[in-house]
Curated annotation (Swiss-Prot):
It comes from Nitrosomonas europaea (strain ATCC 19718 / CIP 103999 / KCTC 2705 / NBRC 14298). Belongs to the CheB family. InterPro entries: CheB-like, CheB_C, CheY-like_superfamily, Sig_transdc_resp-reg_Me-estase, Sig_transdc_resp-reg_receiver. This is Protein-glutamate methylesterase/protein-glutamine glutaminase. GO terms for molecular function: phosphorelay response regulator activity; protein-glutamate methylesterase activity; protein-glutamine glutaminase activity. The gene is cheB. One of its GO terms (biological process) is chemotaxis.
Length: 358
């Protein structure tokens, strides 16, 4: 079997050496080159034709974002970003995902050798996922990063109970998919709970970014909040997010119990809590991502009476989690990403023609 070929682009010689050691220790992948900056990397990409790049966010000679944008316009290929856990680092990372990077890993700040080696499974797993990801040529985007398209309006002749909820789970490619859904939702939509696989330290910045772009309010969940219409609550990178009932109200709860499906936060944990607390009042949404997290929980939601939607294969970066949920029989409707917001709202009011019925 052909090994996944990886080109490392990082201005730190130590990081290049450590990443090379980690990647070459895996039997299914190998480093075929390492460049200190994008200028050197350009020629190596032409001559070596790697399957995946790892790209440092901030480098001399050419900014990582500038290089990524040119790459995705001229020669689209799978890229995993290596990012610092700073406010600027996280903002640059989310811009990189907008430009077409498949995923990112955090660059450790202290005791680099030990902490980076602890990331071995994460780094190699994301390289493996990136090698199979669906990559699109970058098209021109708005300078503010906002997605195109208008807000989907709630039909005025249909009332939506305040009991209704939207429950979303995603992984690889999910930051852009979640943005593309939320940015089209009106401020009077039902409350939303979201689990996106993301390292601790990035979820707050992600929530703040969504809050700036969307008509609804978006925040990192703190636990104990009442779930309000027009508000979305994002699982923090260190905790599972659960839906609970407190009297007549829905509230959020955080848990630091063991990872589920190797993830904390886990989509299964959120979906299972929604099945228990919300039942038929929930609409479940599973978006792009590698693995099976969320499939079993979505089946629980289905059995509890929820209506579930899955992102279709064509619009997914990685058609893993949606495929697993579909295979289990947990999904009621398969929807292209560009139609997801409309279909969610149509289902909540019981209106509209179904897209692809499973």
């Amino acid at each position: 079997m052909k090994k996944i070929s990886v080109l490392i682009i990082d201005d730190s010689a130590l990081i290049r050496k450590l990443l090379t050691e980690i990647i070459n220790a895996r039997p299914d992948m190998e480093v075929i080159g390492a460049a200190p900056d994008p200028i050197v990397a350009r020629e190596m990409i032409r001559t070596l034709n790697p399957d995946v790049l790892t790209l440092d966010v901030e480098m001399p000679k050419m900014d990582g974002l500038e290089f990524l944008e040119k790459l995705m316009r001229l020669r689209p290929m799978p890229v995993v970003m290596v990012s610092t856990l700073t406010e600027r680092g996280s903002e640059v990372t989310f811009r990189a995902l907008e430009l077409g990077a498949v995923d990112f890993v955090a660059k450790p700040k202290m005791d680099i050798r030990n902490s980076l080696e602890a990331y071995t499974d994460e780094i190699t797993g994301k390289i493996r996922t990136a090698s199979t990801a669906r990559i699109h040529r970058l098209e021109p985007v708005a300078s503010n990063g906002a997605a195109s398209g208008s807000i989907v309006q709630m039909p005025r002749h249909h009332g939506i109970s305040t009991e209704k909820l939207i429950i979303i789970g995603a992984s690889t490619g999910g930051t852009e998919a979640i943005k593309d859904v939320l940015i089209h939702l009106p401020p009077d939509c039902p409350g939303i709970l979201i689990t996106q696989h993301m390292p601790e330290g990035f979820t707050r910045s992600f929530a703040e970014r969504l809050d700036r772009l969307c008509k609804i309010r978006v925040k990192e969940a703190e636990g104990g909040e009442r779930v309000l219409p027009g508000h979305a609550y994002l699982a923090p990178g260190h905790s599972h997010l659960l839906l609970k009932k407190s009297g007549a109200n829905y509230v959020t709860e955080l848990s630091q119990t063991d990872p589920v499906n190797r993830h904390r936060p886990s989509v299964d944990v959120l979906f299972q809590s929604a099945a228990h607390c919300a039942g038929k009042n929930a609409v479940g949404v599973i978006l792009t991502g590698m693995g099976k997290d969320g499939a079993a929980g979505m089946l629980d939601m289905h059995h509890a009476g929820a209506y579930n939607l899955a992102q279709d294969e064509t619009s997914c970066v990685v058609f893993g989690m949606p495929k697993e949920a579909i295979t289990l029989g947990a999904v009621d409707e398969i929807v292209p990403l560009q139609d997801m917001a409309r279909r969610i709202l149509a289902r909540l009011v019981g209106a509209g023609k179904q897209a692809v019925r499973v």
